[in-house]
Amino acid sequence: MKHIIPLVLWSLIHLFLLFSLPAHVLAQSKGKLQAGAATSNITPPLGELIVGGFTPLPADEVHDELHARSIVLDDGNTKLAFVLCDNVGIPREVYDAAKKQIEESTGIPIANQLMAATHTHSATSARSANAMVHTTNLNDYQRFLVSRIVDCVRIANKRLEPAKIGWGSVQEPSQLFNRRWYVVEEADRRNPFGGVDQVRMNPGASGLIRPAGPIDPQVSFVSVQSTDGRAIAVLANYSLHYVGGVPGRTISADYFAVFANHLAKLLEANESEKPFVGILSNGTSGDVNNINFQNRGKRYELFQKMQEVGELIATRVHASMKDVSYQDTLTLAAKTEELTLKIRKPDTALLAYVNQVLAKPKDEKPFHVHERTYAERVLQLAESPEDVNVLIQTFRIGTLGIAAIPFEVFTEIGLEIKDKSPFKSTFTIELANGSYGYLPTPSHHALGGYETWLGTNKVEKEASVKIVSKVLELFHLCSASPR
């Protein structure tokens, strides 16, 4: 008997210690999902240049604050981190600096961190002088951005709690229009290199023939909840460029923030003590905006259209969330590889032409309104390295695959990835882990148009083919990852 009593006491102590452990520790020990989410403010000081048009303007007003928004997931074996930043496009060196600090402070591997820009056109530039040249010499705003991205992920990681996750999609074609059109008038198809294209971006209302590409109406979303059903975060994805309707000197996160705020309202998440984080990422929208070129419709007040679009997408996602099936045990995986692409270079004839453009008097009538801008861009690419290494990344969340591509990706590329993916559900986040310009397909390069111009597009014309191949290769590796 005297030997049994200590054994019973030890068993009781063991049970007491076990059940006194924090919930997130118990969940981790059982291989259950944990999740945390956070935001950080990345609004720059006034006076910084807002990019989004051909002429950057200094900010003198803030309509709504800019944020980094993060979700961290942990299946007990693998951690994944998502970060979406309200910015037009962020260079790889900024993300790399943030990822290194995050790995050091949280243990989340660099390869398991997906960072992207929303592509709002009403934010201060985080770009470097030449996207094709890697640099570690960051400017003040880039360093600030690094610190706030790190803070955001650290807080999300600190907030890890037992969670369940599900995903779904809904169709919303009403806001999507391919912006590349075949048009009648040759004068409407001029390019800044003295030639004439087959298609034009953002044409006028007259002389329209047909759009040159498709749209992708699918709104994909991932919903993360606590085990008792409280909304932790939603990550959505929609292939719409940006909306705009913002004065040129005003800072705004565009419809991406409207989505986040309205979804929180619909979920009544603002009433919770623990903050909900809504995120809308940009899909493959390089050739899509929400201008109906055949029927322009009513004129909008400032900020009105982005409010309308953001609220619509949030409402559609919210209504679809009721059909989501949640799970608290599933496989997370990540695969990341560098892909070397050739940088496009001007030939001798083009170099001669752009030098002639720059030699002309500035008051001389140009062949194309933006020819001087593109002459300078061509010369910059001529002086750039021969190739560039870009990151291609894929995440797995159960039977969902997520691709991350560091370009403004044409919609048909995203549709091809969805069609060929080994996962039941798939979406792509563009402008992820870098920002290297537009990514047309080879067939669209043959048509010309703004997105294909040397200086708008900066890498080899076969780049999209190589990138899709790499994405699918990484998807297959992710899908084979063991539990």
Give the ranges of each region predicted by the language model.
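Bacterial N-terminal signal peptides
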Residues: V8-P22
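Conserved beta-alpha junction segments in alpha/beta enzyme cores
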Residues: Q28-F276, S281-T284, V288-E308, M321, ...
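Positively charged n-region of N-terminal signal peptides that target proteins for export
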Residues: M1-I4
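Intrinsic structural disorder/low-complexity segments
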Residues: P6, L17, S122-T124
